[in-house]
Amino acid sequence: MSGRRTRSGGAAQRSGPRAPSPTKPLRRSQRKSGSELPSILPEIWPKTPSAAAVRKPIVLKRIVAHAVEVPAVQSPRRSPRISFFLEKENEPPGRELTKEDLFKTHSVPATPTSTPVPNPEAESSSKEGELDARDLEMSKKVRRSYSRLETLGSASTSTPGRRSCFGFEGLLGAEDLSGVSPVVCSKLTEVPRVCAKPWAPDMTLPGISPPPEKQKRKKKKMPEILKTELDEWAAAMNAEFEAAEQFDLLVE
């Protein structure tokens, strides 16, 4: 009983009244409050502005491209870039290109847009002396598609009122052929060739053409065997079997 009533010294101290501690109880983590941060971290903590910040005016500048003056020239017949690279061979190798050389335009005869188109043969004969070698070469390349008209002569161009169907005259009737150019119409007067062999449907198309008629084949007649010959052949076979059965076979 005495053992139960007795208490240890540590338990008596815990059960006794606690004396008020003179110091404030500290936190376990000892975290710093917000008011103490400026004194502890003076370098990191931003300082209060002593005076109001002076605002600087913002100036907006507009970027404008420099205007390049290009002389107004009527539409040239060829690109100035092509002529620039062609004339590059005659220039000295040490010369550097400038802006004036890049935008330099060569004198090219311009074609008026509102003037009527004259005859190509008359125009080529009158301007052969004026055109240089390159213009003459380019004009030949452009007029290459008109070589068929040149071979026909002036007969097709002498009658501008008549039309030409360019090889499709077979689709026209007899009345419409009267207004076609006579150069092309002369070829149409030929009589069309008629096939000597009459037309017949192709009978060799599988699945489309009707099936061909089957031809009946005659069966070959086999020679008949007489009953007497069969009896003789059966009797000979039976005699051979009987002789084989009567043979004495000795097995040691």
UniProtKB/Swiss-Prot annotation:
InterPro entries: Sororin. GO terms for biological process: cell division; double-strand break repair; mitotic metaphase chromosome alignment; mitotic sister chromatid cohesion; positive regulation of exit from mitosis. Pfam families: Sororin_C, Sororin_middle. A motif (KEN box) lies at residues 88-90. A motif (FGF motif) lies at residues 166-168. The keyword Nucleotide-binding does not apply. Named sororin after the Latin word 'soror', which means 'sister', because of its critical role in sister chromatid cohesion. Belongs to the sororin family. This is Sororin. It comes from Homo sapiens.
